[in-house]
Amino acid sequence: MTEVDDGAELLFFDTFSHEDITDINLDLVQFPKPVFITQVRIIPLGARVQADFPGGVRLGATNPSKFDLEFFVNDLGMPGASAFENLGLLRYNQNDCIHLDCSREKIPTDGLVLRGWYSTITLAVYGILTNSVTQPIASPTLPCEPAGPEMCNLSTEAHNVLLQEEVLKDDWAEPIPTELLVPHKAVVVSDYEHDDIEYGLSREHQHYHQHVDEEQREMRRLRRSTHSTDRSPPPPPMRTHTHSESNEREYIRCSRDKGSRDWSRSPEYSSHRSRRKRSDRSRSDADEHKWPRTPPASIDSPIRPRSPDAMDYDDDDSRSHYKMQASRGYRHSSESLHRDRDDEERSGTPQEQFEPILSDDEIIGDDEEDEAEDVAAAAEYERELEFAAAVAPPAIDAFEPWQRPLLVYEGDLAAHLNKELETLRLLFKKLSLQTRCESVTAFSDEHGLSADEREQFVYLGEQLNNQLGYLSQHYKRRNFVLQQFFSHDDAHLRQAANVLQVALSFQAACMQPQPAFKIRHIKLGARMAELLGSNEQLFGHLLQEQDFDLFEAVLSLYKEPYMALSIKLQLLKAVYAMLDTRLGVQNFLSPKTNGYQMVMDFLKTAKLTRTKYALQAIIKKLHLYEALASVQQCCRQIFLDTDASVPETTPDPNRLDVCQKIEFAFQMLMDALTDSQLSYQQPRRFLPVSKKFEVLTDPTAQRSFGNALQSYFVQHSLAEALLVILSNPKEVPASTFLCTLDLMHTLLRSHVGIDYFVDDAFPVTQMIVSILLGLEEVPSQPRVVEAKPEGKEDKPMDDSVEQKPDEGKAAGIRAAEEPKMAPPPVVRKPILRPVLPRLARLGIELSYKVQTRYHLDAITFTAACPEYDTIKIATHMHSIYSQTCDPSGRQHTIEVLGLNNNLKIFMDLIKKEQRLQTQRQLLSSPGTKYKSPVLSYAVDMVDACVRYCEQLDYLIEHGGVILELAKNHETFEPSVSAVLQEMYVYMKPLEAINVFVYDDIMPLVEVIGRSLDYLTTFPGDLIMALRILRFLAISKPRQKSHGTEELKHRFVALQLYAADGVQLLLQIMERLCTHFEQPGIHAPALMTIQGVHCCQIMLPTLQILRELLSYAILCRDGTYKDLTAIDHLVKVYYLLYYYPSRCQAGAEVEQCKLEVVKSLLAYTQPHEQDAESLHKSLWTLMVREVLKNIDGPAHFIPGLKLLAELLPLPLPMPQPLCDQLKQQHKQRLIIERKLWSAHLHPQSGQIAKLVEALAPSSFPQLAELLQRVCMQLSDLAPNMTLLIAKTITELLCTEYQTSNCIPTTNLERLLRFSTRLCAFAPLKSSMLSILSGKFWELFQSLLALNEFNEVVTNCQEAVHRILDSFLDSGISLISHKSTAQPALNLSAALPPKELIPRIIDAVFSNLTSVEVTHGISILAVRNLVILTEHDFTFYHLAQLLKQKLTEFQAWMERVILHNETVEYHANIESLILLLRSLTQIEPPPPMCAMPNRTLKLGAMELAQLVEFQDIDMARPPVLARILRVLEKYKLLANEAALCDLKQLIVLHASRQEAMGSASMETPAVETENDGANPAASCSTSSSGGSLNVEPFLPQAEGIVTQYDARPIFTRYCATAENPQLTARYWLEPLPIELIEDMNEPLYERIACDLTDLANVCLNPDLATSGESKRTLNLSGSPQSNREMTPTAPCFRTRRVEVEPATGRPEKKMFLSSVRGRGFARPPPSRGDLFRSRPPNTSRPPSLHVDDFLALETCGAQPTGPTGYNKIPSMLRGSRVGRNRGSRISAAAAFRQKKMMRIGSPSSWTESGGGSYRSTSESHFGGSDSHYSSPHYSGRSRGRGLRSRPPYLR
């Protein structure tokens, strides 16, 4: 494809569409200024075009793939020409020729005509704007006022209202476009679709077609506009006959639908309809009159809730105006048009003398008077439009949790539930009239009532129970109706009490004449007590006014002899329901009733299991009530009863106990909501057993338990308790805070929690959201009531629609004022504190779900109103639709739609709209397809649920209806039909008979097998089939000890495993990995809907595979040896790693990664008994396969990240509150690490090779991740830390020796790599054990070098940092609570004592040999300061200073002289710190297991150090000189250094008092040390207390002993910053931007010749161009290079035409992969579920004929059973590209040998870990720097106190 000219710009980009291709089609493109056309490009079907504004992605829609296209232009250089000039002929072929070059002859033109056999065409026109024609072109007049005949009776004010109060915002102001007709086709055109406007207006205002003279005036106006270059459309045919309004409306609509695809798409006058955007699309409502929209960012972008339609880009969503500047971007059309118009007006050119492009039937007239009026009106009208566009809100009503306030819908419940209230009143009225139930006595009287009246009581009571049961299905509805019913009339309360007493009377039941009615009477009473007993008002009335105890009455019936089991269970259910209220629980637990003891007695005497189960549910419900009450009490005790202003230095034991109670209560509540939900219910016909095939759920029992939970939440103010805990995290332990977050997550996953937060605790919910998001205050906005517009985002649409045309001037004023308030405020609230990611995610989830409930409530109330307000419904549905445009908002919104049967709201709306359409068709013309925004939005939301909802409860409930809806898509208008056609592909698996039946899943497996062919085209049916299979095969996660285990899921897993399900799933994974081969280069594609589809396939596939593998390995234990899946799992992880961090499928990607890790951990299940089996264990083999797959630059970082995910995180862990849990966790943590170490030991060689290959890497992110993995490995056990230490030591020594003892860049990298590892306690202990020998000789020789180039300097700095860690006793495996001898602990934290003098000498020599201003000097002084911390090291340092006093004084003189003569430097502060450390003893830390320091230098010794012996005595003293320097540079000097210096001067001045003491004698020990550690001081004084005697240092213990004594737990704080206690620190690669904070060079520039590298690494016969195209998926099908089509798409996101027979897209991708698919064997029957293929088959798999021919061609001889042994690696790579699936189908189920790889790790070790940097840095995110400050700057290091939450995910 040739490029356009350098000066060419994009003049036009759009899509023309026609109904059919039975005739030649014509289209016209007009330009408002003369242009030279240089090139025309046709965009093939599915090709992506990216504009340079955000979200500007378009898809080509050209159809068919081949046709001839002619281009004609109006030559402005030949004004008298009678015909168009032929520009050229393009023989379009989407695989070859797609552009026409017109740059040879430049013809000035203002129009381009297309002529060809096509149905849809997407084209881009490039050219040059010009004014250089033979005659100047007249300036275009302003467009005429586009008022058609339907707008005649609209007043100016009402017209302004309709145009200004828009809901969809235009990003640029633009005049109303005028549609142009194709010359050969005459249709009726209107600038507005007024039939849609009148849909929202009342009938009495629709008088648009009554005056023929007004129509004629408009016709003349349209004709006159043809004089200008604006090219207004020709007039419609004159219609003088009368007609009805409905027929006129239909005629306009039908003609517009046909003609809209044929109108020309000029850049200025583009179509203003969008058939795809639900906010703009096909309105038959009052919001149709919108002007053209800004091309939104929602087209095939991350905010789209579903795949866009290709045919939808031919309207305003894809409108791309020609450019007025050199850049290749789109420009605001209003700016360009106004600038052009102004330029031409200033030029003053005469009237146009060239012939414009006119239609054949256009008539040119001139009425000068009317024309002047029209121009003025058009100018005024355009100004009004610009103002309306400026104030209009955005098209997508995005919900921003940080800016927008949460809303709650307060509808008129009394009106909404009036029908239920009237029904209840009617039933009680019947009871009072037809039965005499005033009292139990009267009813029980034998002669009081007739038999008919008694039976009538049963009939009417059962009807009442049915109505009450309907009310109880919704907690809010039940409470409101009963409260209104009992509050408004006390007679109702008395009557209900009487009826309930009669129903519960055993005597009254016995008075029933027939036995059946006796039973029905008792059941009626039990059911009525269950339904009415939960009302606290009625319960209190019975108890206080009538002294009637409901519990006593029900339990007395329970105690009656010979009571049937079913009635007993019904009575227990009534007792259960009556415990919903606080009054009921108090009465039940009162001494009078003593209900708890009574239930316990029943439990002891009960013989039937079902009775015991019902009784224990009552007990558990009471316990849950008590737990929630304790939460309220504990929060009051912590936050109200205590003085929070008093800081607590030590945790209060009482407070810890209180917080532990809160944790236990929250755990019980989460258990009740998830795992043990069934045990808290009273399900019907449920027999509790340990295992059962299927547990049938009881919706009534679930609703009853949900109502009880919500009632308990309200009674105990759960939201307030959550608020005070979340807002005061420092007042509670971190485990309590994290438990609170877990409870919030659990509540938001259930409809009970969402209903509670919205209906019962909304003000508190607002504050919780503010706390979670870190906002200073709750965004304020008045609550919305039904009579007012719902929120500021809804005001424009509501007002614009509800406004009537006759409201006059007030309407116009209100229209001008209110849009200014419509946009939400953009000022962000200040963030009080850094918000943790988990808190922010939780706040966003809560915001979206509460807001979704608000809109659902509004839709429900509005749809139920007598007046069906479509505008209001569409407004709220548009808001929900807007929420789905954001990935996180879409996820949370869809979750709410899938809960509690909320999708029924949209299904009912669709049914209602269908009925309305049928009525319209009966009244007007049958067969006409009407457009409705409500219907479009409802279908969109159902479609979003089908596409994105992972929970399938909605599908079980509405699947059949949705399938029928999708099948009948042709009955809807085109835009809705397009959505339903795509939805039909998703619903295809539901056509199988009983797809949700567990008995036989083979139809589902067949659907998945067939869908493999469309894996990368439109995989809707595959996604849905995998979701259904996951629903059948995987049970909900629950603890084994809870409830009944369902066997149906295991049964499905067995069926799938027997049907080669593992191979089928691996085939899916392989095809995806093959399609995204080298996934790093596919990052842009993974950002789009392709990535979403890939994750939607991958997630259920991985979950099902994990279930199958876990179950198979669990059953076969050590005999399972199949490693086939590991390769594919690792490749899938590599693909997932390269997803961009902010992609649409971010949450799903993280879930998929976790599933891969869990699947690999399933291989760790078998238990080996001996060492020999340990080396061949499945665990060890899994690790080997993972390590082998880290075999290339693209795999290094994701491979190490996967290894880090698999390994346990380093100790210590956060400490739990409970001591019992602490002991259990301690044993588990230790055993887990020992097992990992044992299974990794056989792979020690491979681990060492990996470290050797990657450690010298110049890529800092890779080195940093490898450091963390090495830390994880070394934390497991002593053998692993010795392995890592020896590997690094060998690397350092080998590198130094091979370079002839000259430091190299590679050595510098290795030393820098080792620096951080030596600061890790386990690795430090092993390094110290091997320090003696060549390792120390390396350090010594490096420090002795006097060449100070950059490499040597960096090496010496790294050595100093390593020695810093070695000498720091804070870095140690010893716990601060150790009870061992302090000197023994010290010996374990220091290098061997014989090396310490040599280390001191080497450091001091290096210090005196380097420049005093060098960084090495400060590091060396730092090490000398560390040596003063303990007596042993201090002694040897003092001895060295005594021996080398001259050198020390010379170095000191150089430091002082530099600061005196040159400039101030920090080295003088280092000198002061060293002198202070020598003369003063720091107070020991409060908790320390090391011996305290007792030795220091006195005044005489200090004088000997600082007084020069061989220098002129006339010079001032050293300390005075230093003081003078600090005073001179007071602004730069450190105040602490100045204070230390003054103390030194005072000490030096006191030397006269110590003249009598001996030289270098140590003074007495400080008193604080005496008190701190008397034992240490005594031992020092006993040894003489002198620097002449070396302190005692014992031999260090072994590494094994140190490991046993290391701390397992540490304390932490939820809000403190300690990243090492978070999982993110260990598992996320460090962002590349933070590397320089770790004293690492950001980049190393390493010379590399890519050509030479390619010649070395690649096969000379490799076709680089073809392989690159194949890898980049530039071909539509990877079948062969001959069929590669550079433009065909993969993962199509447009609308697909469904084949009637198969329901599949017409185009197929993998045609050649039908053979060798792996389904040759028939599936096993149900009776043979446990049959599987044996490990060794007698008939080996055959070699494919194509592969055999390929082997013969390259001269290889097939050997072995398959001939695969000799296949060259490059040929194997091409086989993968052919994608025949033979790698999977040829492998047996229990393959013993692993296939050879294209690349091996050995090929990468030679390069020394060269510079590799990923092509995409956006996915390198997520972790804090380890060295947020230099690790030697502070003293709190090592294994001290930690304060951070546990390993947060």
UniProtKB/Swiss-Prot annotation:
Q: Which residues form the signal peptide?
A: none
**A Gene Ontology molecular function term of the record:** RNA binding
Q: Where is this region: Disordered?
A: 206-364, 783-818, 1557-1584, 1666-1686, 1715-1782, 1798-1849
Pfam families with a match to the protein in the record? VIR_N
Nucleus among keywords:
yes
Q: Which UniProt keywords apply?
A: Developmental protein, Differentiation, mRNA processing, mRNA splicing, Nucleus, Sexual differentiation
The main location is nucleus
Which residue stretches does the UniProt record annotate as biased composition, category Basic and acidic residues?
Answer: 206-219, 242-265, 281-291, 332-347, 785-818
Q: What compartments host this protein?
A: Nucleus
Polar residues biased stretches: 1671-1684, 1800-1818
Any one GO CC term of this protein is: nucleus
Which stretches does UniProt call biased (Low complexity)?
Answer: 1732-1742
The answer to whether keyword DNA damage applies is no
Per the entry, what this protein does is:
Associated component of the WMM complex, a complex that mediates N6-methyladenosine (m6A) methylation of mRNAs, a modification that plays a role in the efficiency of mRNA splicing and is required for sex determination. Required for sex determination and dosage compensation via Sxl alternative splicing: m6A methylation acts as a key regulator of Sxl pre-mRNA and promotes female-specific alternative splicing of Sxl, which determines female physiognomy. M6A methylation is also required for neuronal functions.
**Which family does the entry's similarity section mention?**
Belongs to the vir family.
Fetch the PANTHER family from UniProt: PROTEIN VIRILIZER HOMOLOG (PTHR23185:SF0)
List the protein's name: Protein virilizer
In its UniProt entry, the species of origin is given as Drosophila pseudoobscura pseudoobscura
